[in-house]
Structures are given as C-alpha cells and as structure tokens.
Amino acid sequence: MSRPDSAVSLLPDYSLRAHNTFGFDARARVAARIGSPGQFASLARDPRVAGLDRLVLGGGSNVVFTRDFDGLVLLDEIRSRALVREDDGAWYVEAGGGENWHAFVEWTLAEGMPGLENLALIPGTVGAAPIQNIGAYGLEMKEHFASLRAVDLATGELVEFDAARCAFGYRDSFFKRDGRGRFAIVAVTFRLPKAWTPRIGYADVARELAARGIDARAARARDVFDAVVAIRRAKLPDPLALGNAGSFFKNPVIDAQAFAALRAREPDIVSYPQPDGRVKLAAGWLIDRCGWKGRALGAAAVHERQALVLVNLGGASGADVLALAHAIRRDVLGRFGVELEMEPVCL
C-alpha cells in the first residue's frame, strides 16, 4: 500500500552540506524532505517534532550556518509550474516553492511568456524569491508578483498572501520581519503582462547586447535573458566550484543630504538616484575602495572580480565568513560613514 501524501519520514543528524551554497557542513538535529503542502501541515501536528525550532530550506543560497541547527530542517521539494489563467492583459503563472528559480524563468520564456528575464541565474528557489524580493538589472520580483500560498508552520493552516500583505521592500518582505520563520511558501503566482518591453536601463545589459550585435531597442526577451546570464557568469563564481551566497551585502540607500556630503569627498562614487529622492550606493564599489576585493581572512575571501561576493576558498566555516563580513562592514563604516547590511540569514 502506498504511503499517504502527508506521511513524512524523518532524517536524524542530517548533513546540510549539500543544502547550502557555501558548502558548510552544518548538521540538523532532524530533517524532512517535503513534497507537498500537506506534508508541511502534518508536521505541525507531529508529536515526533513537537517543540523543535523549524527552518525551511530551498536552495540554501541565502543562509550562513555558523553552527549546527538544533531543530527540524524542512527541505522544500515542492516542484511544479503551470499557466493557471490568462486574460487580455496578462498571463498568470504559478510555480511550486521548491522549483529552481532560474529553471522557472527559462521555462516562462520557452512558453512565450516574458517578463522575468532580468532575474535570470539568480540562485535559489521560487519559494525564496518573495522572502528576499529578489532583484537584478532594474527589475524586482514584486513588480510581477500576484500572490502566494504558504503553510503556517505552527498550525498547518494554508494561508493566501497578496502583495500588500507581503509588504515588499528592497531585498525585504514580511517574511524577513514579523513573518520570519513562521511560514513555508508552497506556491507563488506571477502576473506577466502581454505588453512586454525590454528592461535595459543598466549599462552592463546594454553593453552586452551591443557586444552581441543587438540593437537594444529591438532586443527580444531571450536576448535580454542571454545577456544577463552571460554577465552573471562573467562576474559571479559558480557555487559548485567556489562556495558563495551571491551578493552578500545590500546596496545601501542614503538621503540626498548625506549623499551630497559623501560625493564632495568621493566625486567618482557610483550611485543610483531613487524615485523617493534618496540615493542608492554600489556596495561593491565601497568595498573595493576599502581595498577588500580579492583579499582573504583565512579560508574566507572577497571574490577577485566582484567585491559583493564572499567566498569559501575551501575549509572555511560560517564563523570565518561572518568575521570577514564584520571586518568589511567596519572599514566601510569608518571610511564612508555608511553601514552595510548583510543579505543572507546567519544562523
């Protein structure tokens, strides 16, 4: 007889090395592979794991383990993708929380539904995308977000979230604040407008298109996708070859007065004006100016081509990476008066 959909096998003393892109060999007291929302719900009532802290892991691309996790790690393996409806203005596509983000983006293009191409090759899963409100090359996920479904880990209840309830911000959402650790995102629906125009405001994208002989004004979604993939592969290390979590720091946003004072001291500072009058600074530029690009502290290092990326050279611990991050933050604050915020969750 087959096991019921909600039945879950528990994996004691489980290695998380293959479940975090830094490759840290942290261990979970117990883990469970989750293939359906019902399995998340059943564990909320399971006496075998009563009272244990819970951590949902997708691709592990936004986490730094500084120690073993003395609780239950839920490995989200809910994989699905489908066009769930369409109207005259848009397609609505849904993907499971454990679906690989890049593969999902590529699928939408293959199905003739553009819009997410600027977010190509961002590591992680679909379920992690709203938590971080991922963004790159002039596009944030929230711009195409429609809704999501999540399981309340305490009660097992399935809850629907719209954009307002998610409270998206810059690399931020409800799930990083009041909702942190409380929900498992099992499905996300995106609205992809049929009236598509390329997002090519970033100079890197325009340059890559030009290098390929493509007029930016005539670029197709696949052209933008290919350009973004090429840029990211040139700048960012492959986690399978060199452990990392992508961009480790957020680009800081400061008010106009603080920026004017900073630019008076640093005329060539890289910056991006924001609609609200504030100014976003390039964290990588700040780190590079402090002399950190390519430097190492033990087996943890700043990547030689992209100062935003911290890497595990082999044998580094989460504590080593965190020590490097703190040293960088201290130097940037001391030189520029700007505080860098780390993107990954440190446990």
From Swiss-Prot:
<comment type="pathway">
    <text>Cell wall biogenesis; peptidoglycan biosynthesis.</text>
</comment>
<dbReference type="GO" id="GO:0071555">
    <property type="term" value="P:cell wall organization"/>
</dbReference>
<keyword id="KW-0274">FAD</keyword>
<dbReference type="GO" id="GO:0008360">
    <property type="term" value="P:regulation of cell shape"/>
</dbReference>
<feature type="active site">
    <location>
        <position position="343"/>
    </location>
</feature>
<dbReference type="InterPro" id="IPR036318">
    <property type="entry name" value="FAD-bd_PCMH-like_sf"/>
</dbReference>
<dbReference type="Pfam" id="PF02873">
    <property type="entry name" value="MurB_C"/>
</dbReference>
<keyword id="KW-0521">NADP</keyword>
<dbReference type="InterPro" id="IPR016167">
    <property type="entry name" value="FAD-bd_PCMH_sub1"/>
</dbReference>
<dbReference type="InterPro" id="IPR003170">
    <property type="entry name" value="MurB"/>
</dbReference>
<comment type="function">
    <text>Cell wall formation.</text>
</comment>
<comment type="similarity">
    <text>Belongs to the MurB family.</text>
</comment>
<dbReference type="GO" id="GO:0009252">
    <property type="term" value="P:peptidoglycan biosynthetic process"/>
</dbReference>
<keyword id="KW-0131">Cell cycle</keyword>
<feature type="active site" description="Proton donor">
    <location>
        <position position="247"/>
    </location>
</feature>
<keyword id="KW-0285">Flavoprotein</keyword>
<dbReference type="GO" id="GO:0005829">
    <property type="term" value="C:cytosol"/>
</dbReference>
<feature type="active site">
    <location>
        <position position="171"/>
    </location>
</feature>
<dbReference type="InterPro" id="IPR006094">
    <property type="entry name" value="Oxid_FAD_bind_N"/>
</dbReference>
<keyword id="KW-0963">Cytoplasm</keyword>
<feature type="domain" description="FAD-binding PCMH-type">
    <location>
        <begin position="24"/>
        <end position="195"/>
    </location>
</feature>
<dbReference type="InterPro" id="IPR011601">
    <property type="entry name" value="MurB_C"/>
</dbReference>
<dbReference type="InterPro" id="IPR016169">
    <property type="entry name" value="FAD-bd_PCMH_sub2"/>
</dbReference>
<dbReference type="InterPro" id="IPR036635">
    <property type="entry name" value="MurB_C_sf"/>
</dbReference>
<keyword id="KW-0133">Cell shape</keyword>
<dbReference type="InterPro" id="IPR016166">
    <property type="entry name" value="FAD-bd_PCMH"/>
</dbReference>
<dbReference type="GO" id="GO:0008762">
    <property type="term" value="F:UDP-N-acetylmuramate dehydrogenase activity"/>
</dbReference>
<keyword id="KW-0132">Cell division</keyword>
<keyword id="KW-0961">Cell wall biogenesis/degradation</keyword>
<dbReference type="GO" id="GO:0051301">
    <property type="term" value="P:cell division"/>
</dbReference>
<protein>
    <recommendedName>
        <fullName>UDP-N-acetylenolpyruvoylglucosamine reductase</fullName>
        <ecNumber>1.3.1.98</ecNumber>
    </recommendedName>
</protein>
<keyword id="KW-0560">Oxidoreductase</keyword>
<dbReference type="Pfam" id="PF01565">
    <property type="entry name" value="FAD_binding_4"/>
</dbReference>
<dbReference type="GO" id="GO:0071949">
    <property type="term" value="F:FAD binding"/>
</dbReference>
<keyword id="KW-0573">Peptidoglycan synthesis</keyword>
